[in-house]
């Protein structure tokens, strides 16, 4: 855990926000989906870093950049040294340098989509060629 805390402190700029979500109100398996449904409060130019009490992961999400404040959900600006996980809360930290990292993430997602489309086109062409061969073969017989 010390490495993660050090990595967190070293990697963060003074502008750091912490969003708390009471995990008793959320199915933890659907945490990202739950967070991504929350909207209306925008943190511009920031990368979300999500800390769970039992672990750590980082996820770039467009929807996570918009937040709706509710009784169970609140946001606060925090000092650099307090950017660490909380015991019964999910803490979402945002750090600067969102723009490039998120653009890269979007490009990767677009690349994946393009590869899927290209693969679908290739398969469709193969099926079409097979049908043409079958049609020609049946005409010749």
Question: Where in the sequence are the language-model features?
Answer:
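Short, conserved charged micro-motifs
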Residues: 25-32, 57-63
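Short, intrinsically disordered low-complexity segments
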Residues: 40-86
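Short acidic DE-rich linear segments
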Residues: 135-141
């Amino acid at each position: 855990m010390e490495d993660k805390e050090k990595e967190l402190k070293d990697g963060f700029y003074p502008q750091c926000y912490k969003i708390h979500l009471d995990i008793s109100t959320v199915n933890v398996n659907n945490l990202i989906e739950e967070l991504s449904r929350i909207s209306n409060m925008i943190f511009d130019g920031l990368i979300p870093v999500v800390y769970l009490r039992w672990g750590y992961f980082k996820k770039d999400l467009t929807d996570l950049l918009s937040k709706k404040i509710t009784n169970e959900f609140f946001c606060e600006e925090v000092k650099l040294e307090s950017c660490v996980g909380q015991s019964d809360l999910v803490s979402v930290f945002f750090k600067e340098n969102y723009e490039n990292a998120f653009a890269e993430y979007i490009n990767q997602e677009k690349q994946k989509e393009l590869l899927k489309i290209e693969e679908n086109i290739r398969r469709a062409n193969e099926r079409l060629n097979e049908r043409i061969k079958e049609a020609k073969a049946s005409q010749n017989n």
